[in-house]
Amino acid sequence: MAVTDVDGDGDLEVLVAGYNGPNLVLKYDRNKKRLVNIAVDDRSSPYYALRDRQGHAIGVTACDIDGDGREEIYFLNTNNAFSGRATYADKLFKFRGGRFEDLLGDEVNEQRDVANRMAGRSVACVDRQGTGRYGIYIANYASGNVGPHALIEMDEAASDPSRGVIALTNVAEQAGVSKLTGGRGLVVGPIISQSRSDIFCDNEYGANFLFRSNGDGTFTDVAAQAGVEDPTQHGRGVALADFNRDGKTDIVYGNWNGPHRLFLQLSTNRRQRFKDIATQKLSMPSPVRTVLVADFDNDGELEVFFNNIAYRGPSANRLFRVSRREHGDPQIEELNVGEATEPDGRGTGAIVTDLDGDGRLELLISHGESAAQPISVFRVNPGTSNRWLRVIPRTRFGAFARGAKVIAYTKRSGPHSRIIDSGSGYLCEMEPVAHFGLGKDVATSVEVFWPDGRSVARRLELGDMNSVLEINYPTEEQEATAAAEIECGNGFIVNENGRCTDRDECTQFPPVCPRDRPVCINTYGGYKCRANKRCGQGFEPNDEGTACVAQVAYFGGTRSSGRGLGTQAPRLCVAVLGLAALQLP
């Protein structure tokens, strides 16, 4: 499933990939409070082509590939193939001449033989050049030397968008991502880059890839150095988040019947590395499909949802809250997922979006593969009084800025960051919105960073809470922000460019640390003090400075130990909306 504005009316619709039936476009009818399929079986409908009844679609994504301000829609088909070559090509639909048409079926693209005819899995969008025009990254499932990963973009020199001519080309080899593997999960965003889009692929029967952007449209795989190769496991759903609110992007993903991972990003000698902090409960193996991250109850802390498929027996979905802790790894607690447990569900995908505009996220789960089942729609009851903020950045062309990073600074809880989804979960793409739950806190300013490095900051007032903000791509004049206009919250100051930056309390005079713990260590948004204890090579003082402990040495291989929680987690009541029993044509 994927979320985008299909009909151009400003509201978001849900695309559903149909494997043994037509693709669907589900629009929320606010009067009837139900989802309605607008891709009807009527050739006069502008959405008729999207149905693509012949395709066995399993993945879908949407983004603006030609810079017209409207997102194109890519369906990944796997007809008659688990791996290698399929018998039916993927489809890339553009709204042209009042209706959706397949660009890959255009004569110019048939001559170029650019259509992907491989058995792929996930698809995602990446703006590798920072132009606001996206390419479609396809995680193909190779068979021997057949079926490398692909990256399809518009060939600007051969195209004439004003006349509807969009010539496509596969630039995977040029970009450095043409790899052969059992491609599975895929996610895009500024993972280890400041604002440029990196690509993480979790794979089956092979090591994961972490493609770092080189800033020139090419990528380098740094998974081994970063410690996220996980070569003996079989990845599925994956998502990005900043769980401990330290300004770095973390990675959470599920392995098929293997230990699930929550990789927290570290900074060791200015090198990006990750450590797995998954607790025993979170890492518990399951037949996992989609993994997504959201703040369902708007309390300011993130939840991780694992959607499982009933494979050789029941397998319930699971939900975990990951809460920031001062000077420590986040606390992870399992929640009661309520009616969304679905132990007999044949889960194949899941997305989050705000269907009814009330500021609370709905969870949609698709099913299929081994048995036909309806789509489920859930909402969370707790948190109705919590504040929230939704931010929608736009590209220079006015489309959704997939891959942009949004940071909301608050009065009490520090900065919260989100990445506008470019394709994630597993075979899915979330809504193009940065959704912030604030609890009782207030956001004071928001910053947006686009994949080309441009940014903008905006001061927020109390009246901006519980609202949706659209932020356009900035001109040079708009990019400059007066420092006096911005409020960053505790632990941060405004720099000369009008952006919030960490305050280094350790340089203050008089010193902030007491005499018995004189060593000051600056942290993101704060500091910590410890005793002046020296340690030998390979060891470092603990947080209190009272003992020497081994330095973090897990950078891949076996799972690091996690701290289990023995307390009973609070119940998170998930109730089915009135539209759970969908009547779809």
Predicted regions: what is each one?
Residues I136, A158-S159, G164-I166, Q272-M284, ...:
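Gly/Ser/Thr/Pro-enriched helix-cap/hinge segments flanking short amphipathic alpha-helices
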Residues P22-V40, G84-L104, V146-V171, A207-V222, ...:
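Beta-propeller blade repeat segments, especially FG-GAP/WD-type strand-to-loop junctions
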Residues Y19, R43-T61, E107-C125, Q174-V188, ...:
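Repeat-based blade/solenoid architectures
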Residues V552-R571:
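C-terminal GPI-anchoring signal of eukaryotic secretory precursors
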Residues F82-G84, G97-R212, G217-A224, D230-L240:
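Solenoidal tandem-repeat scaffolds enriched in leucines and small polar residues
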Residues M1-G8, H56-R70, A119-G135, G183-S193, ...:
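Beta-propeller blade termini
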Residues G8-G18, G67-N77, G130-A139, S193-D202, ...:
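Acidic/hydrophobic-patterned starts of short beta strands in beta-sheet-rich repeat architectures
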Residues I486-V512, A531-Y554:
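N-terminal entry motif of extracellular EGF-like repeats
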